[in-house]
């Protein structure tokens, strides 16, 4: 299984799993097939929130940051709404001087 596991850049209580090839567990690959480049696992029954990012296509560092910030937005706002996560992610990236990554989210047109 090839995954990079680390603590989130912006929240020490959130784990990030970066999938780098097709040998990741099937339930993780199925989640990515349904959700796209990333998804967040959080809620009442989840002790440690997890962000899963699909990096099988060699994303740029700014793309990885944009995905992480967006998914962290779902966790921090406790919202399934894409607009809530996107606005949180853009604000987080801007506040941390990562305008190029924020621009990636802005260019998606979610907000």
Give names to the regions the model predicted.
Residues 19-62, 75:
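Active-site scaffold of zinc-dependent metalloenzymes
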Residues 66-78:
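Active-site recognition of the HExxH zinc-binding catalytic motif
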Residues 8, 45, 94:
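Acidic surface patches and DE-rich sequence motifs
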Residues 14-17, 51-53, 68-69, 85:
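Hydrophobic beta-strand residues in large extracellular and virion-surface proteins
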Residues 1-13:
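Zn2+-dependent metallopeptidase catalytic core
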């Amino acid at each position: 299984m090839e995954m990079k596991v680390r603590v989130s850049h912006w929240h020490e209580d959130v784990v990030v799993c970066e999938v780098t090839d097709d040998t990741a567990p099937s339930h993780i690959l199925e989640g990515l097939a349904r959700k796209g480049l990333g998804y967040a696992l959080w809620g009442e029954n989840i002790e440690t929130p997890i962000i899963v990012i699909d990096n099988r296509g060699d994303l740029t560092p700014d793309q990885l940051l944009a995905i992480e910030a967006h998914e962290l937005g779902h966790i921090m706002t406790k919202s399934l709404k894409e607009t809530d996560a996107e606005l949180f992610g853009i604000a987080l990236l801007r506040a941390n001087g990562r305008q190029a990554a924020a621009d990636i989210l802005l260019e998606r047109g979610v907000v």
